[in-house]
C-alpha cells in the first residue's frame, strides 16, 4: 500500500513512522509534482489547520486533494486534518477541503496545557489510545457521516465513505 502524507506542516513525520511500522510505503506531498504520484490513500496530519490551508491554496493543492476525495480516494485526517475535511467549523466561514458532513469546534479542549490522553472504544476497532493536543471535537455528524468514538460526551472520530477523521493523534 502506498500512502501520500501531506507534509506541509504538523505531525507528518510521526504519521509516516507509524504507517511504515505497519508495512505501508509512504511518500511526502510538499508540492503539486509530489501529488501526481500514484497513491492508495492520503493522510492529513495534525498541526495548524490555518497554516496547512494557506499552503494547500498557495501550492495549488487544495482542488486536486478535494477532487481526489470527492472521486472516492481514501483519506485519514487527524486533528487539523479533521478541521480541513469538515464542511462546517463553528464560528468560521472560509473555504477548506470540506468533504465531510461534520461540524467541528476548533481548539475545543483549550490551550496546550489542556492536552490529555484517553483510551476509548472506537466502533469496529476496539479500545484505542488517544492523545488530544489543543484538539477539536466533532459537534455533529450528518448522514452519510457516522460517529465512531465518543470521549466525555463529545464525538472524537467519524467516517463517511472512505474518509476517516479523528480529533486525536493516534
Where do the model's predicted regions map?
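Redox-cofactor binding/interface segments in oxidoreductases and associated redox assembly factors
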Residues: 43-44, 77, 166
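N-terminal beta1-alpha1 cap of cysteine-dependent amidohydrolase-like domains
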Residues: 1-58, 63-68
Amino acid at each position: 500500500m502506498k500512502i501520500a502524507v501531506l507534509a506541509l506542516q504538523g505531525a507528518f513525520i510521526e504519521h509516516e513512522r507509524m504507517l511504515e511500522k505497519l508495512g505501508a510505503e509512504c511518500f511526502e506531498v510538499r508540492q503539486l509534482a509530489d501529488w501526481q504520484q500514484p497513491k492508495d490513500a492520503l493522510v492529513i496530519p495534525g498541526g495548524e489547520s490555518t497554516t496547512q490551508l494557506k499552503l494547500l491554496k498557495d501550492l495549488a493543492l487544495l482542488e486536486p486533494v478535494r477532487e481526489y476525495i470527492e472521486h472516492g480516494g481514501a483519506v485519514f485526517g487527524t486533528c487539523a486534518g479533521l478541521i480541513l475535511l469538515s464542511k462546517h467549523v463553528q464560528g468560521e466561514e472560509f473555504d477548506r477541503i470540506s468533504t465531510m458532513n461534520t461540524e467541528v469546534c476548533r481548539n475545543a479542549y483549550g490551550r496546550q496545557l489542556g492536552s490529555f490522553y484517553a483510551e476509548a472504544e472506537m466502533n469496529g476497532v476496539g479500545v484505542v489510545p488517544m492523545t488530544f493536543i489543543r484538539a477539536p471535537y466533532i459537534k455533529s455528524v450528518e448522514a452519510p457521516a457516522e460517529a465512531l468514538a465518543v470521549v466525555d460526551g463529545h464525538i472524537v472520530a467519524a467516517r463517511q465513505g472512505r474518509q476517516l477523521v479523528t480529533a486525536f493523534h493516534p
